[in-house]
């Protein structure tokens, strides 16, 4: 037998291969190429939000207190949007507005654009992380497809909607009570609850919650009792080859309850993916429509009849009056720079008054 001794046929690794090996190495927390986008942007987005809610006032942009330092709590603190006068400026720290002054940048609302843009890229990086990991372990990329729903909603609400309006001012501020206020704004100015895309979104999200509850309960109800552990978590090996629960039994049960049931796991789980993701995408499309000031359903005949007949009123006409009240009160409070003053005779009144 002849043994050939010589140089290895492998070529030396270039910089890209070395980085690829290090980034995709098997470790406790996967980094990957997507991590180069995800980790820095998520760090800056969260850091900006914690900084803003802790220290930064909204007095100069909204006339509000919005930080822990001013007495807010977790539910009322927020990173507020820039003033309406700043329109769609990126509000870069080194830009003409702040001119490198960090304090002035915070006062102008620069942290909001900072958090919004870094947060958007962090969400995209997280979706790419799911793609990358799925490819590495030879899975299909449906996790990433599912995560596109929340990304679509975030981008449409925080970026596309204010881009269609006069400025970032009309986007939601990053805070719990601030987003509640934004929801009221959406109802008053866009009649959002009567928008068909909102209806599809509600059906998707609540339908998904119902599907999750039914699915979880059904699996628990049809577990095979062949484990000897003290509870569900100890009774089965995560790498077992056999089924954990009986699809046949579940099918028979729901066939008797509803008259119809899913016949296989693939269709069942695809449906559980399809319902919430489609609902979120429909909501996102609806918000893009609102950015262009597209209207929801208008039942003008009911409005005309209610105006002519004091005894005629529907839940729709009552809601329209409520929306007018939201606009009349919120516009003056929310946009003090417009100096809006409404005479009492134009403020909405119910037909009984």
From Swiss-Prot:
Residues holding a plastoquinone: 215, 262
Chain sites annotated for binding chlorophyll a ChlzD2: 118
Annotated SUPFAM superfamilies: Bacterial photosystem II reaction centre, L and M subunits
GO molecular function, one term: electron transporter, transferring electrons within the cyclic electron transport pathway of photosynthesis activity
Pfam families documented for this protein: Photo_RC
GO biological process terms, semicolon-separated: photosynthetic electron transport in photosystem II
EC number of this enzyme: 1.10.3.9
Sorted UniProt keywords: Acetylation, Chlorophyll, Chloroplast, Chromophore, Electron transport, Iron, Magnesium, Membrane, Metal-binding, Oxidoreductase, Phosphoprotein, Photosynthesis, Photosystem II, Plastid, Thylakoid, Transmembrane, Transmembrane helix, Transport
Mode of membrane association: Multi-pass membrane protein
Subunit: PSII is composed of 1 copy each of membrane proteins PsbA, PsbB, PsbC, PsbD, PsbE, PsbF, PsbH, PsbI, PsbJ, PsbK, PsbL, PsbM, PsbT, PsbX, PsbY, PsbZ, Psb30/Ycf12, at least 3 peripheral proteins of the oxygen-evolving complex and a large number of cofactors. It forms dimeric complexes.
Stated role: Photosystem II (PSII) is a light-driven water:plastoquinone oxidoreductase that uses light energy to abstract electrons from H(2)O, generating O(2) and a proton gradient subsequently used for ATP formation. It consists of a core antenna complex that captures photons, and an electron transfer chain that converts photonic excitation into a charge separation. The D1/D2 (PsbA/PsbD) reaction center heterodimer binds P680, the primary electron donor of PSII as well as several subsequent electron acceptors. D2 is needed for assembly of a stable PSII complex.
More details: 2 of the reaction center chlorophylls (ChlD1 and ChlD2) are entirely coordinated by water.
Similarity section: Belongs to the reaction center PufL/M/PsbA/D family.
Record's protein name: Photosystem II D2 protein
Organism: Adiantum capillus-veneris
Taxonomic path: Eukaryota, Viridiplantae, Streptophyta, Embryophyta, Tracheophyta
